[in-house]
Amino acid sequence: MILNKEIETIILVANKNELSFTTENKSTFIYEIGVGKVNALLSLATLYEDIKALGINPVLLNVGTVGCTRYPIGHVLYPNYYAQGDAYTDGFFLENTLFLKGQGVIESVSLDKFDYEEALLTSDRFINVNTAFYQDIKHLNPLAFDMESYALANFCLLKNLPFHSIKIVSDNCDGTVKDWESILGEISGRLGTILDEFMRDRLVKEKIDIPSVS
């Protein structure tokens, strides 16, 4: 499918092979953004130019997998806070750091109003609880870890785009990808149902009329 004026929802996925699903919904567009913050940002910036050229205002929905130490594999998360996961954010570096909140409308909040325990931390690595890096941040007890969401949410804040995310726990940050690899098939099979439920129960509350994707 080609992006067109009929598109109402754009589903952003890091890799179409990671979450393999299709949709016959002509108002839904699936867009691959690549893995990592830089790839995600560059891909979304390119997509944004196409969105502007068409004069449309779609909802952006990021769907993907996360590492999580608090919930079992297969658990579905709807993050409401986003932060850098591997950048130094102390002292004067805080002046250039945004802490983001929201599903739909994204806003920047002060650190004292930011809830790390409900936050998705974005970094360019698989998180391993046995590393020194994790030891430095484990006191924050974050909701989960991914590789794209903060960059996407930040861009949507700057461009005033509606942004939502659905994340599925694929590994428990144990230092291997064995859980991630084995869960992908099960996740792909559930994805259509998960998206339908999300659009019906959450997006409709915002008075956005979006048809089923499954």
Q: Where do the language-model regions lie?
A:
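Active-site rim beta-loop-alpha module in soluble metabolic enzymes
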Residues: G91-K159
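Metabolite-binding pocket within alpha/beta catalytic cores that recognizes anionic/polar moieties
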Residues: M1-Q103, L143
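Active-site-adjacent mobile loop/cap segments within catalytic or ligand-binding domains
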Residues: L140-N141, F145, A151-I187
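Generic hydrophobic alpha-helical segments
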Residues: A40, L44-I51, F133, I187, ...
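Hydrophobic/aromatic beta-strand patches that form the interior of the parallel beta-sheet core
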Residues: Y31, L61, L77, Y116-L121, ...
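Regulatory input/activation interfaces that engage signals or partners
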Residues: I168-S214
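Glycine/charged-rich beta-loop-alpha catalytic/anionic-binding loops adjacent to active sites
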Residues: T23-Y31, F133-H139, N172
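Short, well-ordered, mixed-charge alpha-helical segments that flank or form enzyme active sites
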Residues: T69-Y71, D86-A87, I127-N130, N154, ...
